[in-house]
């Protein structure tokens, strides 16, 4: 008997999520994790590190509720959006009995989180234009307790039709929780489904400070939902989920002055995205630049592997999507600074 064989069988067979950092590389330009290209400057204001943190940091809860336009009863603070995903699966799905459903190509952590919890996964691929296939979803809802959708979708960058999300909420009412992952919503805030919370008690929204707020290293996310759903999740979440320093910096990030700064910097990044998309379109190696509402672009190349490898060797680290469903020869490029975008274009231009 070895340590490995003592572990659960599903864990022995598990292929872990391949995060950008785990994939590594020796880059000087990191455009593979959808991080903001520059870091904000905050200073820790508290020194009470000898005390355990609050179960839920109330100043952060209040600040995010104000920002999102909801009540504090609608907010649960989590260790990044990923903990929110895991928490919902653990709370609502019986292992080896219930299933989640998601629509690839999409964020890989839905599948990994279900697998580690011993929960089944069902998939209904997106349509050719990366939208929900509602008839097929309806046909696959047996035993499904949670449906995950991502809008803007990672890695494709497009928005799901809000009318389709509304239809999804209607066909799942009384049957399953619908989770809308809005990790990238700050880049298109008008597309949020937060206005649907009051009418759909089975809707949960995932948010994060990792993207537009440029705080990926903080690991601070949120679940937004009706009070009953939040109360149930609160039974399961760890007793001290948010470290004191993380709560301190998150509260500073959510002050009105910094939110205004984030919104201004977001406009600058969107300008860089527009420039990058136009510049990539004219390159001989690039066959298509997909429309994006997020801080990244998905491109289809004549030879995606050659482009990815050539830039990797120059220290420009992108995200290879070649093995992702329907994304052969595709690469995801995080929108960086204008200088970084220019270097990406020049490097791809040189690929033969």
Swiss-Prot record:
The modification N6-(pyridoxal phosphate)lysine is found at residue 211. Keywords: Amino-acid biosynthesis, Aminotransferase, Histidine biosynthesis, Pyridoxal phosphate, Transferase. Signal peptide: none annotated. Coiled coil: none annotated. InterPro entries: Aminotrans_II_pyridoxalP_BS, Aminotransferase_I/II_large, HisP_aminotrans, PyrdxlP-dep_Trfase, PyrdxlP-dep_Trfase_major, PyrdxlP-dep_Trfase_small. It is an enzyme of class 2 (transferase). Pathway: Amino-acid biosynthesis; L-histidine biosynthesis; L-histidine from 5-phospho-alpha-D-ribose 1-diphosphate: step 7/9. Its EC number is 2.6.1.9. It catalyses: L-histidinol phosphate + 2-oxoglutarate = 3-(imidazol-4-yl)-2-oxopropyl phosphate + L-glutamate. Its cofactor is pyridoxal 5'-phosphate. It comes from the Bacteria. Homodimer. This is Histidinol-phosphate aminotransferase. The lineage of its organism: Bacteria, Pseudomonadati, Pseudomonadota, Gammaproteobacteria, Pasteurellales.
